[in-house]
């Protein structure tokens, strides 16, 4: 039986599912299997009935929602009129990527797996549940699952006689060729594709809006341990509109110092211009890269040299290495037996791609430029809750950004790429423009004017609730109850004066929790319990909606536990009934969360 074309379809929000899908494509080609890799919504879903072998790679977002680039597919595949034999010719497998700190961990992958079985598909394997919370990340589940997958696939569809697997030490052809230009082209100028003011289409990832930064203000006290910024952008003429709960995506860049260091280590001329040419006819050039492009632009705006490399990075780097000792170490890091050592070298200290290349200088200096886009992942956009309403701040968009910085055993502090880049931008020193676009968030607020809302937002989790409060107050909705948690009243009490003014106007009831101002720490869940009778009255008798945003570590579980206690003490419910009551709130979208790790 001839080997079929393997189809890998992905639904990806942050890029991880796409990375895993491309890894699947590489491993398939190494095993002499033809392979196509596509986003689910770019694939004509009606053709699925003709596909013999499909791997689905799906992330789960928000409250168990599918990623944006598989929502059309999701609606189609769950149509009730699809026959139960629609996919009876298909062998399939589903690989899920999620975060076990969320209640609906890998919900999309689990639900899709069940649906494909209902439609007659044959599962090659149980669904894979990759977990961001694992110390090795999703690879802890993905690696053994992929080994089993290839055993099953090759057992069903062995390669033609005489065609052996391409050995791991031999690099596959690069996805692109870089055609270097001897001189600058006479027409056109380098720059990313952007949405221009007055454009018919709203800004998107392929065409972001270059928003002028109006202000970049630190809102934590000078002695506070964390630098938190309130940043405002001008979106006049962008075509951007948003509502409370929506998020803005920002495309960050690498620092000039890191770009210079990268070019030095790899022996690249940052001003060298090139044209990017795909090797395969069905592969298109990245829309974010101009043609022609300079090496400086590629490294500054596209290659994520500040990310922690995955195992696949070491696999390809070992293939490209010409230095015996360095190659030996890279092969060890990329082997199954070397994963513990790789974790200690790379994952635990959060060592970056740039730092790894500096540790392997002979290998780095010999990397063919054609392989840069295969070796280094693309810089992914970062999502921030919008912290303002267009009804209060017309043509403006504000975000609250906690600058990520922490120490590991490495001498240099670890810094978040996007938050550090944003914090470094100073509109007072000259014009600053930031590529951004907006998408719907996971929080949806009630449209009925008399429905109260309870919002629990410790730290920067308060950002979407500021947008909601501004929007609701502008619409005359006064039933706003905000539980805000921070450490110190005089250090990180964001928008204190604004909240107090709204309280004076009877537009807001503010319940703060200052965790460090007394010997016994007080958190938002403690204030909820203190005001349990009010919370029960609002939820049970007034039909209030309850919202929670912030760090996913333990706060969501603590708040849920506080609610369960309130339901039992104030509502007289037994424990199972309290759990059922909470579940009903979640099912009817009267209890919504937006948390992050």
From Swiss-Prot:
FMN binds at residues 12-17, 59-62, 97-106, 132. It is found in: Cytoplasm, Perinuclear region. Its cofactor is FAD; FMN. NADP(+) binds at residues 460, 515-516, 521-525, 558. It holds the Pfam family FAD_binding_1. Its EC number is 1.18.1.-. One of its GO terms (molecular function) is NADPH binding. Changing residue 522 to I: In allele NDOR1*1; shows a decrease in affinity for NADPH and a reduction in ferricyanide reductase activity. Optimum pH is about 8.0. The keyword Amino-acid biosynthesis does not apply. Interacts with CIAPIN1; as part of the cytosolic iron-sulfur (Fe-S) protein assembly (CIA) machinery. Interacts with DCPS. Belongs to the NADPH-dependent diflavin oxidoreductase NDOR1 family. This is NADPH-dependent diflavin oxidoreductase 1. The lineage of its organism: Eukaryota, Metazoa, Chordata, Craniata, Vertebrata.
């Amino acid at each position: 039986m001839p080997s079929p074309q393997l189809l890998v379809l992905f639904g990806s929000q942050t890029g991880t599912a796409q990375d895993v899908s491309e890894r699947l494509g590489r491993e398939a080609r190494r095993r002499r299997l033809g392979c196509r890799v596509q986003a689910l919504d770019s694939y004509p879903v009606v053709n699925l009935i003709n596909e013999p072998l499909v791997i689905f790679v799906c992330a789960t977002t928000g409250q168990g929602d599918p990623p944006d680039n598989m929502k059309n597919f999701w609606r189609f595949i769950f149509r009730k009129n699809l026959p139960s034999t629609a996919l009876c010719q298909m062998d399939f497998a589903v690989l899920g990527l999620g975060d076990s700190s969320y209640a609906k961990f890998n919900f999309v992958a689990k639900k899709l797996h069940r649906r494909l079985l209902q439609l007659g598909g044959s599962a090659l394997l149980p669904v894979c549940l990759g977990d961001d919370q694992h110390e090795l990340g999703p690879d802890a589940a993905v690696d053994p699952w992929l080994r089993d997958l290839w055993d099953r696939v090759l057992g069903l569809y062995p390669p033609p006689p005489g065609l052996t697997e391409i050995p791991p030490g031999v690099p596959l052809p690069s996805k692109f060729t870089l055609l270097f230009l001897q001189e600058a082209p006479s027409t056109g100028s380098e720059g990313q594709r952007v949405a221009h003011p007055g454009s018919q289409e709203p800004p998107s990832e392929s065409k972001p809006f270059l928003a002028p930064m109006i202000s970049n203000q630190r809102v934590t006290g000078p002695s506070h341990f964390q630098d938190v910024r309130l940043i405002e952008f001008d979106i006049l003429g962008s075509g951007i509109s948003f509502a409370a709960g929506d998020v803005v995506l920002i495309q960050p860049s690498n620092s000039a110092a890191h770009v210079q260091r990268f070019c030095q280590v790899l022996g690249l001329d940052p001003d060298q211009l090139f044209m990017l040419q795909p090797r395969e006819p069905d592969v298109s050039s990245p829309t974010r890269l101009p043609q022609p492009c300079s090496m400086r632009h590629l490294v500054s705006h596209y290659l994520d040299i500040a990310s922690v490399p995955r195992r696949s990075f070491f696999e390809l780097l070992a293939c490209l290495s010409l230095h015996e000792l360095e190659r030996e170490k890279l092969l060890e890091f990329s082997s199954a037996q070397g994963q513990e050592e790789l974790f200690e070298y790379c994952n635990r200290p959060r060592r970056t791609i740039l730092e790894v290349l500096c540790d392997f200088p002979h290998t780095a200096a010999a990397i063919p430029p054609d392989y840069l886009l295969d070796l280094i992942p693309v810089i992914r956009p970062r999502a921030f809750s919008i912290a303002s309403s267009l009804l209060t701040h017309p043509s403006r968009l504000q975000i609250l950004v906690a600058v990520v910085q922490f120490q590991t055993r490495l001498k240099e502090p670890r810094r978040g790429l996007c938050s550090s880049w944003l914090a470094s931008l100073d509109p007072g020193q000259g014009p600053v423009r930031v590529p951004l676009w907006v998408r719907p968030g996971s929080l949806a607020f009630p449209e009925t004017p008399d429905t109260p809302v309870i919002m629990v937002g410790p730290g920067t989790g308060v950002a979407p609730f500021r947008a909601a409060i501004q929007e609701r107050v502008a619409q005359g909705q006064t039933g706003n109850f905000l539980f805000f948690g921070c450490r110190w009243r005089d250090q990180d009490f964001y928008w204190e004066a604004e909240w107090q003014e709204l309280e004076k106007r009877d537009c807001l009831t503010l319940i703060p929790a200052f965790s460090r101002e007394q010997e016994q720490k007080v958190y938002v869940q403690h204030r909820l319990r203190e005001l349990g009778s009010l919370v029960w009255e609002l939820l049970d008798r007034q039909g209030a909606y309850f919202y929670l945003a912030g760090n996913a570590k333990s706060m969501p579980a603590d708040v849920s536990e506080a609610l369960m206690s309130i339901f039992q003490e104030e509502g007289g419910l037994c424990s199972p009934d309290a759990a059922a009551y909470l579940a009903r709130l979640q099912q009817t979208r009267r209890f919504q969360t937006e948390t992050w790790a």
